[in-house]
């Protein structure tokens, strides 16, 4: 089992500031059409983001470089050689110029063998946080699946065994895929969590600024981008009560975002300045509740009747006042409060703030709920008009709180 601190780290949203290089061969393959290449890359990033969302990872495209004149290092068909060259180029040239968490080379070269991608395993936030993908198919979704697969390796995820399943398939980390993959398997999620706790990559905890993101703003992708105030995903998925998922704008001030749950709770309203609903707040202590049967106390409406029902069941109610008068005796069972180990009897006005007495409906008994020390009236319980129990005394509700 994990420590609370480990669980906090696992649950935290992760952000990969992602840099993509399109090499010269891919540029030529798309007939020197930079706008078309950009759209293709933006669509891929969007697809990759969708696949990583269940892992609480957001991919933020903070740089897209198209090598329209020539490659900045020699891109070779040997995948491992190109990966090493790309790693060295990122380290010496790209990082000093533009900080990033991970970089990808998207190449038009035909990599040797059956490989269409290669990555350093478990390498995020290190000098080896790079991968190479061949743009091997016109179908964007297939290449986006390969991007997700190789970035998965960077995140410590191994290839799936035969026993690993995901619905719908095929799984993203299968070694060989012929169709676009949509989901990580349970094995992949386990690998990823083990990698996170082992290596603790820190660079993925900071959220990129909206001005750093170079891809066009898409309302519904969980990123607050230029022109958006909030982004909580699709209208069906949105969990932010004060963000309008359809427009990615804050809901107006005064819109109710959390209804009052009961008499002693207050409704919360959006501020117009935040996507989140304000903290749950309670009705003030002493506010009348349950048709004036009680007064609010710390978000509850304590009454003697409810206390009897909670302890003994729905067939019980509070005893008549005659039973409570026994609290003036100050003996073993009937008293108002303890002082230095001594049971203090109740004054006549305080009897309903001492030992609790309940009666089975349609009987006249004075029952004491079973407890060796007796059950006392709860603090804040109404003991008369405008009066509540406080420290074993029946006091004015105006001065009690």
From Swiss-Prot:
Chief localization: secreted
Enzyme Commission number: 3.4.24.-
Native source organism of the sequence: Naja kaouthia
Cofactor note: Binds 1 zinc ion per subunit.
Keyword entries, A-Z: Calcium, Disulfide bond, Glycoprotein, Hemostasis impairing toxin, Hydrolase, Metal-binding, Metalloprotease, Platelet aggregation inhibiting toxin, Protease, Secreted, Toxin, Zinc
Example of a GO cellular component annotation carried by this entry: extracellular region
SUPFAM superfamilies found in the cross-reference section: Blood coagulation inhibitor (disintegrin) (SSF57552), Metalloproteases ('zincins'), catalytic domain (SSF55486)
Entry's family note: Belongs to the venom metalloproteinase (M12B) family. P-III subfamily. P-IIIa sub-subfamily.
Residues with attached carbohydrate: 112
Function: Snake venom zinc protease that inhibits hemostasis by binding and cleaving the vWF in humans. Also has and inhibitory effect on the collagen-induced platelet aggregation.
Organism placement in taxonomy: Eukaryota, Metazoa, Chordata, Craniata, Vertebrata
Binding residue positions for Ca(2+) 2: 218, 221, 223, 225, 228, 231
Name recorded for this polypeptide: Hemorrhagic metalloproteinase-disintegrin-like kaouthiagin
UniProt: Ca(2+) 1 binding residues: 17, 101, 203, 206
UniProt-annotated catalytic positions: 150
Subcellular location: Secreted
Residues that hold Zn(2+) according to the record: 149, 153, 159
Tissue: Expressed by the venom gland.
The keyword Lipid biosynthesis appears for this protein: no
């Amino acid at each position: 089992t994990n420590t609370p601190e480990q669980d906090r780290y696992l649950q935290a949203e992760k952000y990969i500031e992602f840099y993509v290089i399109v090499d010269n061969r891919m540029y030529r393959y798309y007939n020197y059409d930079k706008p078309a290449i950009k759209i293709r890359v933006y669509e891929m990033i969007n697809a990759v983001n969708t696949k990583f969302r269940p892992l609480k990872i957001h991919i933020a495209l903070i740089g897209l470089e198209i090598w329209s004149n020539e490659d900045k290092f020699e891109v070779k068909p040997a995948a491992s050689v190109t990966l090493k060259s790309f790693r060295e180029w990122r380290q010496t040239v790209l990082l000093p110029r533009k900080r990033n968490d991970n970089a990808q080379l998207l190449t038009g070269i035909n990599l040797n063998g059956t490989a269409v991608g290669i990555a350093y395993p478990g390498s995020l936030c290190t000098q080896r946080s790079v991968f190479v993908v061949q743009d091997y198919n016109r179908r964007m979704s297939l290449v986006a699946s390969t991007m997700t697969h190789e970035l998965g390796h960077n995140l410590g995820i191994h290839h799936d065994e035969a026993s690993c399943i995901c619905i719908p398939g095929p799984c993203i980390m299968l070694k060989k895929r012929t169709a676009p993959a949509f989901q990580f398997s349970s094995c992949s999620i386990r690998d990823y969590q083990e990698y996170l706790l082992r290596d603790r990559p820190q660079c993925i905890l900071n959220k990129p600024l909206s001005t750093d993101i170079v891809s066009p703003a898409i309302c519904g992708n969980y990123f607050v981008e230029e022109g958006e105030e909030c982004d909580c995903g699709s209208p069906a998925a949105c969990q932010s009560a004060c963000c309008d998922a359809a427009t990615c704008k804050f809901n107006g001030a005064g819109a109710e975002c959390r209804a009052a749950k009961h008499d002693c709770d207050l409704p919360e309203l959006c501020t117009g300045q935040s996507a989140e609903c304000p903290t749950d707040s309670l009705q003030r202590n002493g506010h009348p509740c349950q048709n004036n049967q009680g007064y609010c106390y710390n978000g509850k409406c304590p009454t003697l009747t409810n206390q009897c029902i909670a302890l003994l069941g729905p067939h019980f109610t509070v005893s008549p006042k005659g039973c409570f008068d026994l609290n003036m005796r100050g003996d073993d069972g009937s008293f108002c409060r303890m002082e230095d180990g001594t049971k203090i009897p109740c004054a006549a006005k305080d009897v309903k703030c001492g030992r609790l007495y309940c009666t089975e409906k349609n009987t006249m008994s004075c029952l004491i709920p079973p407890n060796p020390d007796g059950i006392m009236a709860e603090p804040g319980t109404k003991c008369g008009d405008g009066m509540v129990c406080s420290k074993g005394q029946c006091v004015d509700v105006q001065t009690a709180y």
